[in-house]
Structures are given as structure tokens and as C-alpha cells.
Curated annotation (Swiss-Prot):
Signal peptide: none annotated. Pfam families: UPF0688 (PF15772). It comes from Rattus norvegicus. The modification Phosphoserine is found at S172. Belongs to the UPF0688 family. Residues 23-57, 98-158 are annotated as: Disordered. Keywords: Nucleus, Phosphoprotein. This is UPF0688 protein C1orf174 homolog. One of its GO terms (cellular component) is nucleus. InterPro entries: UPF0688 (IPR031530). Residues 121-131 have a biased composition (Basic and acidic residues).
Length: 222
């Protein structure tokens, strides 16, 4: 009986050991799995960060290229330099060249000059030379007329300055504005002087008459 009990105890202890070993192995396997999962998550996050950095770098590079392309499109100097330069041609030169080409071929004489390149020549000097009339006096008369007209324009026209006040200051020695009471002064200046009814007398005669009148008054009072 004791041997059976011992064998049963040995068996039970072996079973317990096997169970404990299996539990420890399971725990270690769980720890390993958790560590591997943590490692995988760290690797995944690091890979995501690396991909984000790469995409941001690519985006910045693409942006820089787009900006450069837009600047090259907007820059007007490159467009102007690429265009061919056109040299302006004067119309008179072309007409002179055509006239030279026509002169090589015999053609009837044209009295009218080309339009826009030369002024028509007046025929008055030739007619005057044929008639034998002098041209200098006419030019002198024209110069005198121009001089007289310029002198008349240069002379200032007198402007009548009207005073705004009816009576001037009492302290001033200036006369009253006549235009306020008698109208336009310029019309009065052209009138002839008024003729006096009595003959003019000298100052001495006037004084003598004055003193005589005084003496007569005194005699009458006395």
C-alpha cells in the first residue's frame, strides 16, 4: 500500500511539474508574442514616418519645379528676346527708291512732286524775275506790318480800377471816386472844357475886389 501511495505521489508531483513547465512555457511564449507585436508596431510606425518624410520631400520638390516653370512663363524678357526684331522703314526712303527705279525707264515728266516727302515749289519768284519787278520792297513792307502788329499787341490796355468804398478815408489826400456819382470817367475825359461865362481875371484883381468888398462892408457897419 505504501508503495502504491509513493508511486501515486511521484506521479502526481511529476504531473504538477509538467503542468508548471507548460504554464511557464505558455507565459514565455505570450511574452515573446507581445514583444514581437510591439516590435512590429514600432517598425510599422517607423516605416510610416519614413514614407511620410519621403512624400513631403517629393511634394516640396514638385512645388519648386512648378514655381520655376511659372516664373519662366511669366518672365517677359525671355519672350521679348525670342521674338524677331523688326526694323522700321521710312516711307520716304521707299518712295525715293521707287522713283530711282522709274527714272531708269524713260517716262513723261511729272510736274507734281511726290506727296509726303517734299514741299511744292512756288512759281512766284520765277514769274517776278521774268517781269523784272523787285522783291525786296515787298519783303520790307511785310516786315514792317509784322512789327507794327507785334507792337500793338505788346502795348497794355489801361484797365479802369474801381474803388469799392463810396468815400475814401478822411486822412488821405486822394479824391473821391467820381465814377460812383458821375458814371464812366473815360467818357468824361474826351469832352471839351467848359467855357466860362465871365472873362478870366488874375489873382491880383480878385484880391483887390475882395479887399474893396471888405472895406465897403466895414463902412456900412460904421
Amino acid at each position: 500500500m505504501r508503495s502504491r501511495k509513493l508511486t501515486g505521489g511521484v506521479r502526481s508531483s511529476a504531473r504538477l511539474r509538467a503542468r508548471s513547465c507548460s504554464s511557464t512555457s505558455l507565459a514565455s511564449a505570450g511574452d515573446i508574442a507581445s514583444s514581437t507585436s510591439a516590435k512590429t508596431t514600432c517598425l510599422a510606425s517607423s516605416s510610416h514616418k519614413a514614407t511620410d518624410r519621403r512624400t513631403s520631400k517629393k511634394f516640396k520638390y514638385d512645388k519648386g519645379h512648378l514655381l520655376k516653370a511659372e516664373l519662366q512663363k511669366v518672365d517677359p524678357k525671355s519672350d521679348i528676346s525670342s521674338l524677331p526684331k523688326v526694323v522700321p522703314v521710312a516711307p520716304c526712303e521707299n518712295k525715293f527708291a521707287e522713283d530711282g527705279a522709274e527714272a531708269a525707264v524713260p517716262a513723261p515728266e511729272n510736274t507734281a512732286p511726290p506727296q509726303g516727302c517734299s514741299k511744292p515749289v512756288s512759281e512766284e519768284p520765277s514769274v517776278k524775275a521774268e517781269e523784272g519787278l523787285p522783291t525786296a520792297p515787298r519783303s520790307a513792307a511785310a516786315a514792317q506790318e509784322t512789327h507794327d502788329s507785334s507792337a500793338s499787341q505788346a502795348e497794355p490796355v489801361p484797365v479802369l480800377q474801381m474803388d469799392s468804398s463810396v468815400f475814401l478815408d478822411d486822412d488821405s489826400n486822394q479824391p473821391m471816386p467820381v465814377s460812383r456819382f458821375f458814371g464812366n470817367v473815360e467818357l468824361m475825359q474826351d469832352l471839351p472844357p467848359a467855357s466860362s461865362s465871365c472873362p478870366s481875371m488874375s489873382r491880383r484883381e480878385f484880391r483887390k475886389m475882395h479887399f474893396r468888398a471888405k472895406d465897403d462892408d466895414e463902412d456900412a457897419e460904421g
